[in-house]
Swiss-Prot record:
<keyword id="KW-0699">rRNA-binding</keyword>
<keyword id="KW-0694">RNA-binding</keyword>
<dbReference type="GO" id="GO:0019843">
    <property type="term" value="F:rRNA binding"/>
</dbReference>
<protein>
    <recommendedName>
        <fullName>Small ribosomal subunit protein uS13</fullName>
    </recommendedName>
</protein>
<feature type="region of interest" description="Disordered">
    <location>
        <begin position="98"/>
        <end position="124"/>
    </location>
</feature>
<comment type="function">
    <text>Located at the top of the head of the 30S subunit, it contacts several helices of the 16S rRNA. In the 70S ribosome it contacts the 23S rRNA (bridge B1a) and protein L5 of the 50S subunit (bridge B1b), connecting the 2 subunits; these bridges are implicated in subunit movement. Contacts the tRNAs in the A and P-sites.</text>
</comment>
<dbReference type="InterPro" id="IPR018269">
    <property type="entry name" value="Ribosomal_uS13_CS"/>
</dbReference>
<dbReference type="InterPro" id="IPR019980">
    <property type="entry name" value="Ribosomal_uS13_bac-type"/>
</dbReference>
<dbReference type="GO" id="GO:0003735">
    <property type="term" value="F:structural constituent of ribosome"/>
</dbReference>
<comment type="similarity">
    <text>Belongs to the universal ribosomal protein uS13 family.</text>
</comment>
<dbReference type="InterPro" id="IPR027437">
    <property type="entry name" value="Rbsml_uS13_C"/>
</dbReference>
<keyword id="KW-0687">Ribonucleoprotein</keyword>
<dbReference type="GO" id="GO:0006412">
    <property type="term" value="P:translation"/>
</dbReference>
<dbReference type="GO" id="GO:0005829">
    <property type="term" value="C:cytosol"/>
</dbReference>
<keyword id="KW-0689">Ribosomal protein</keyword>
<keyword id="KW-0820">tRNA-binding</keyword>
<dbReference type="GO" id="GO:0000049">
    <property type="term" value="F:tRNA binding"/>
</dbReference>
């Protein structure tokens, strides 16, 4: 099992897919990394040599923001939006959809489970 950017890559998968287990690397970025390092995308992780693993590790560390650094940057961006009090920041603070989706009947993922309000009975 190869360890790159603090993530154990699954050894039975192709390296092109295995790199996507790293936060911040998708299929397109994975292909770019493999092309830059000259590693065969169809090779399995268990078949990689130490030299290829170190090339991949070096390429990712020097040219891409991944895992903890990327998570910190995203959190800082959201914190900044909240601090300046813009519309997007307010939506983040209230836990509502940020990108203009309707909230009257949907948005359950952002709003969480329904808070049912009990109806008051009329006393006799």
């Amino acid at each position: 099992m190869a360890r790159i950017a603090g993530v154990d890559l699954p050894s039975n998968k192709k390296i092109e897919i295995a790199l996507t287990y790293i936060y911040g690397i998708g299929r397109t970025t994975s292909k770019k990394i493999l092309q830059a390092t000259g590693v065969d995308p169809n090779k399995r992780v268990k078949d990689l040599t130490e030299e290829e693993i170190s090339k991949l590790r070096e390429e990712i560390e020097n040219n891409y923001k991944v895992e903890g650094d990327l998570r910190q940057e995203v959190a800082a961006n959201i914190r900044r939006l909240i601090e300046i009090g813009c519309y997007r920041g307010i939506r983040h603070k209230r836990g509502l959809p940020v990108r203009g989706q309707r909230t009257r009947c949907n948005a359950r993922t952002r709003k969480g489970p329904r808070k049912t309000v009990g109806a008051k009975r009329k006393e006799k």
